[in-house]
Amino acid sequence: LQNLRDTLSQGMDNVRSSVHDLHDDALDLQVTLQRLLKDYSFCDGTLEYDVLHPLSQQTIYHILAIVKESMNNTMKHSNATKYSITVREQPAFYQLILRDNGTRHSSVPWQTRGIGLSNMQERVADMHGYLNITHTSGFQIYITLPKEDKP
């Protein structure tokens, strides 16, 4: 049990330090996501990134905060061994997919919106997007964000 606590603590520290400078004016989303996954020692992480046009710094900030919260939830509430981030650009929107392969070991039902999931929903709503959660073969968060007029 102590090993688990130490691992969780180390993982949380790594994630916190990786996003310490979220307010940097020149954040590169792909590089920052790669760094987050590299520092995410709790399980193996992968990134699929297919975005050609730049996102606004505010959108990048929101996406990074959502990813950080999702990673924290995976560490705290699942026994996942794999975690993936997919960011895709479509003609009218951006798509963010966050997945893990775990099964929940928390006593709280997945449908219960804790603070973390509620914060994600609020961020997505602030960007006029949509959030959908499924729990088949792990836990998946699907987010669709409309493109901004100006990045």
Located regions from the model:
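DHp/HisKA dimerization-phosphotransfer hairpin of two-component histidine kinases
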Residues: L1-D44, R88, Q95
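Helix-loop-beta hinge of the Bergerat
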Residues: D25-H62, V67, M71, M75, ...
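Conserved catalytic submotifs in the C-terminal HATPase_c
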Residues: T46-Q58, Q90-P91, R99, T134-T136
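A conserved short beta-strand within the histidine kinase catalytic ATPase domain
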Residues: N73, T81-R88
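ATP phosphate-binding glycine-rich loop and adjacent ATP-lid/helix-beta elements
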Residues: P109-Q140
